[in-house]
């Protein structure tokens, strides 16, 4: 769903604000993960906290993101409460992204928000 001018540098998306359809700030993009196929798999969203203190990192499937409503933003069609239930980790304890279970849980949780998906809500506790 990422409808941005391509090609573009990934670095242009670092520190970009991510908002939902209600224009609530969900966080900022802090990093990216590349899959085994060489494509961008996840945008790593910094969420919560204050000035980077106390925040958690949430891997968001790259294809769940869209251009934002405001210039210089990216949009994710999810409410804050649902986002807060997603798998997350602290910046000092990155998970093993090669673990199949981790990928499956993330993909299952965000399936409703990927391009072409129906607008069903993820099942709470599915991660």
Q: Positions of the model-derived regions?
A:
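Peripheral interaction segments used for macromolecular assembly
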Residues: 1-127
């Amino acid at each position: 769903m990422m409808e941005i001018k391509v090609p573009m540098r990934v670095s242009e998306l670092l520190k970009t604000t991510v908002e939902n359809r209600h224009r609530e700030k969900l966080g900022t993009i802090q990093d990216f993960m590349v899959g085994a196929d060489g494509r961008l798999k996840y945008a790593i969203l910094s969420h919560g906290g204050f000035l980077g203190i106390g925040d958690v990192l949430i891997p968001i499937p790259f294809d769940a993101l869209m251009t934002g409503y405001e210039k210089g933003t990216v949009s994710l069609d999810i409410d804050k409460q649902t986002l807060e239930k997603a798998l997350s980790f602290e910046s000092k304890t990155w998970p093993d992204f090669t673990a199949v279970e981790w990928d499956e849980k993330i993909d299952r949780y965000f399936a409703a928000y990927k391009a072409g998906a129906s607008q069903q809500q993820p099942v709470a506790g599915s991660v």
